Amino acid sequence: MYSKIRIVGKIDVLTGLHIGGGGETSMIGAIDSPVVRDPYSRLPIIPGSSIKGKMRSLLAKHIGLIPGQKMHNQDAPEILRLFGSSQKGAIQSSRLQISDAFFSKASQEEFDKKDLAYTETKFENTISRLTAVANPRQIERVTRGASFDFHIIYNVENINEVMADFENIKTAIHLLENDYLGGGGTRGNGRIRFVIDSIDTVVGDFDSSNLSIK
């Protein structure tokens, strides 16, 4: 029974979020590390690859890594079936498709009403232990209180593994909520919260009414 299940919700930003947008030229006086933005709207986004990568990393550590493991293709089978494998001769498609999360319309309206900026500039400073020379820099962060719309597609490939897969998705989300997303997490950045609005079958006839991840 091949089906697709869609998970829709919000990602709430609890502390300033920094996911860098590479490839931008920094001018004199410009922010040293800007956040990644949607080229169309110019609003901050959370790349699906960032969400997926952090979920995979945390879940793999939680389930247990192979001693001496150096490659993600050596993850446990339950990780590989959710997130995929690119190993030559054993390529495995990911059951999860995590889209970019876009700045929500509700957040735009709330921020505009309160005259709040969508992003903020955080000043950081490192000092060389050898020379005592300071190296100040400016980091752009998505402002606390922002909310992003997200959706995930889960491909049902084996009905006997759906419940276990959703338990692992639930665990990965819980781990991420108690860790951080993006850069500077040890300095307070990147605390987020998932709010699940709906889980429904959009292709096929798999009964998703009993599924939950929160």
Swiss-Prot record:
Part of the Csm effector complex that includes Cas10, Csm2, Csm3, Csm4 and Csm5. One of its GO terms (molecular function) is endonuclease activity. It comes from the Bacteria. CRISPR (clustered regularly interspaced short palindromic repeat) is an adaptive immune system that provides protection against mobile genetic elements (viruses, transposable elements and conjugative plasmids). CRISPR clusters contain spacers, sequences complementary to antecedent mobile elements, and target invading nucleic acids. CRISPR clusters are transcribed and processed into CRISPR RNA (crRNA). It is an enzyme of class 3 (hydrolase). The gene is csm3. It holds the Pfam family RAMPs. The keyword Hydrolase applies. InterPro entries: CRISPR-assoc_RAMP_Csm3 (IPR013412), CRISPR_Csm3_endoribonuclease (IPR052216), RAMP_III_fam (IPR005537). The lineage of its organism: Bacteria, Bacillati, Bacillota, Bacilli, Lactobacillales. It comes from Enterococcus italicus (strain DSM 15952 / CCUG 50447 / LMG 22039 / TP 1.5). This is CRISPR system Cms endoribonuclease Csm3. Belongs to the CRISPR-associated Csm3 family. Encoded in a type III-A CRISPR locus. Its EC number is 3.1.-.-.
